[in-house]
């Protein structure tokens, strides 16, 4: 099997290079009373950032990209709407499966990242016949947390830098895998959601499979509840899952009546528009698009991949 290595040099730097580029002149002015040292440091970081991005781009020239329409029978703009009764039935079945197979095992983040990256690489290789090796490095903080306060994790698709901003409990393997799909070069959110889910489900690892199913359940609940926070919490309570699982699901949505910060609301709207301008459906691709993708995949008669991958 062909092997390709994306260097991802920027991910091994002790600090996010984009953070250094943005803040070095300001920090230099505040600490030293002069901006020149900061500008020199910023320029050096920019050079490293550009060099890393160029090396990654050159490595990707030989990549075999997954054709989603061919492999799964659908793509961002060709999704079938999943019927509401089918959604509700799926919610009940996933909740039951999660309850029966629950594991409270927690894997240290650096080990989890390596495991997730391995299974993602192998899953994609089974489709393309090519292993694309990438970094497993993850940061705990970047300035993106201030810009996107609603996000649990981010990936700079230019440098491949990934950061997770908080402990995400049972969902963490999926969040890591989602960002690692971006690191491999797939920048559309629907593609990241789908490949992450399918890779984790194929792993056979109870912790990773649980994360995939929990993400699928969470997204179905979001679709059914819409913008109604109380409806979401009522749906979770109605499933009568074990307390540990219910708490994880409740924690993803604010209590009814609580207001998001104005920064979060504004940035969500801007990010939604940015996604639409790049040929995506917007933030809805995280939940409506993702669940519709799995539904369309199972209903497609011309997908190269076996539809049982989307079953559970």
For the regions a language model picked out, list residue spans one by one.
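Membrane-interface segments at or immediately adjacent to transmembrane helices
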Residues: 63-115
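Amphipathic alpha-helical blocks and their helix-capping loop/short-beta junctions
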Residues: 223-251
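Active-site recognition of the HExxH zinc-binding catalytic motif
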Residues: 172-186, 190-193, 197
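Pan-zinc metallopeptidase signature
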Residues: 245-312
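Short helix/loop segments within enzyme catalytic domains
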Residues: 196-233
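Sec/Tat-exported extracytoplasmic proteins
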Residues: 102, 124, 128, 184, ...
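N-terminal low-structure segments adjacent to metalloprotease catalytic domains
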Residues: 1-86, 311-312
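Auxiliary, metal-adjacent structural segments of Zn-dependent hydrolase domains
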Residues: 99-160, 165, 169
């Amino acid at each position: 099997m062909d092997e390709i290595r994306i260097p991802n040099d920027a991910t091994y730097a002790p600090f996010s290079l984009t953070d250094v580029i943005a803040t070095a002149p300001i920090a230099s002015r505040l600490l030293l009373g002069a901006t020149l040292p900061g500008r020199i440091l910023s320029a050096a970081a920019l050079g490293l950032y550009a060099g890393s991005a160029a090396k990654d781009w050159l490595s990707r020239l030989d990549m075999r990209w997954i054709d989603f329409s061919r492999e799964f029978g659908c793509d961002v703009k060709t999704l079938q709407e999943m019927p509401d009764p089918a959604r509700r039935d799926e919610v009940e079945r996933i909740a039951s499966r999660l309850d029966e197979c629950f594991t409270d095992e927690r894997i240290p983040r650096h080990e989890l990242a390596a495991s997730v990256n391995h299974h993602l690489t192998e899953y994609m290789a089974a489709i393309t016949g090519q292993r694309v090796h990438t970094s497993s490095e993850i940061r705990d903080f970047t300035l993106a947390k201030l810009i996107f306060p609603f996000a649990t994790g981010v990936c700079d698709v230019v440098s491949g830098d990934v950061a997770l901003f908080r402990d995400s409990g049972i969902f963490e393997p999926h969040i890591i895998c989602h960002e690692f799909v971006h690191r491999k070069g797939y920048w559309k959110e629907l593609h990241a959601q789908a490949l992450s889910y399918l890779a984790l489900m194929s792993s056979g690892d109870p912790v990773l499979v649980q994360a995939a199913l929990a993400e699928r359940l969470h997204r179905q609940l979001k679709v059914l509840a819409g913008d109604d926070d109380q409806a979401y919490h009522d749906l979770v309570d109605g499933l009568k899952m074990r307390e540990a699982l219910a708490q994880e699901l409740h924690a993803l949505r604010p209590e009814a009546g609580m207001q998001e910060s104005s920064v979060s609301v504004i940035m969500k709207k801007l990010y939604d528009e940015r996604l639409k301008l790049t040929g995506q459906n917007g933030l809805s691709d995280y939940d409506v698009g993702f669940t519709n993708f799995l539904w369309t995949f199972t209903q497609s008669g011309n997908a190269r991949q076996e539809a049982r991958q989307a079953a559970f």
